[in-house]
Swiss-Prot record:
A molecular-function term among this protein's GO annotations: ligase activity, forming carbon-nitrogen bonds
Superkingdom assignment: Bacteria
Cofactor entry: Zn(2+)
Residues where ATP binds: L11, S12, G13, G14, M15, D16, S17, A18, T19, L20, L21
Reactions it catalyzes: 7-carboxy-7-deazaguanine + NH4(+) + ATP = 7-cyano-7-deazaguanine + ADP + phosphate + H2O + H(+)
Annotated gene: queC
Protein name, as recorded: 7-cyano-7-deazaguanine synthase
Length: 218
């Protein structure tokens, strides 16, 4: 099977991005990882991201500071005055854990690294159950890819397209877990909890989704 040349993967330390990283190792010749410290309540995830990047033997792992998010209010992930909800996500509206324009900012930063590294794939692990978040929907990914291509020095010089690689868009979290099992992802070394506690709280939406997805696997 022919591999693509290079990719930079958005790596949070959770099960979705870890599975994407292992998939990228299979599908690409060179794999880079990028993680973000944006003042998140669950900053402990970065410890897991570092370990995963090391285990995956990536070319390089970049950790980028995004300090302005601490100035924003209203998101339970970056505003300590907002309580992290318990139970499942709401179905028809963005949850209180939404961080404004997070994936737009992260993809923009990752695209700058991709431009500089001259790799034309940027990997993001959004999936079908992420749709309450506006910046996890297929139409956002399509628009982000178009914007990246319009502004890329790499594209202008090399006459090649940039691609936002989002292979899980049509998959459930359970599907991702099963793929991860097939790929040998060390799920025990991933972290998903909005509270940022160790051990995880087991009650927040991402803890519940993780437990359901990994049932019988981990």
């Amino acid at each position: 099977m022919k591999k693509h040349d290079g990719i930079i993967v958005l790596l949070s330390g959770g099960m979705d991005s870890a599975t994407l990283l292992w998939l990228a190792k299979r599908e690409f010749k060179k794999v880079y990882a990028i993680s973000f410290d944006y003042g998140q309540r669950h900053k402990v995830e970065l410890k897991y991201a570092k370990e995963l990047a090391k285990l995956a033997e990536v070319e390089d792992h970049f950790i980028v500071q995004v300090p302005f998010y601490t100035s924003l209010k209203g998101s339970a992930l970056i505003d300590e005055s907002v309580e992290v909800p318990k139970g499942e996500y709401p179905e028809n509206e963005p949850p209180v854990t939404t961080v404004p324009m997070r994936n737009l900012i992260f993809l923009s930063i990752a695209s700058a690294f991709a431009d500089n590294l001259e790799v034309n794939y940027i990997g993001i692990g959004v999936h079908a159950l992420d749709t309450p978040y506006p910046d996890c929907r297929p139409e956002f990914i399509t628009a982000a890819e178009a914007a990246i291509n319009a502004g890329s020095t790499f594209v202008a010089k090399k006459k090649e397209r940039m691609h936002v690689y989002a292979p899980f868009l049509g998959m459930s979290k359970r599907d991702i877990a099963l793929l991860g099992k097939e790929l040998g992802v060390p799920f025990e070394k991933t972290y998903s909890c909005y509270m940022g506690t160790e051990p995880p709280c087991g009650e927040c939406p991402t803890c519940i989704q993780r437990e359901e997805a990994l049932r019988g696997i981990l």
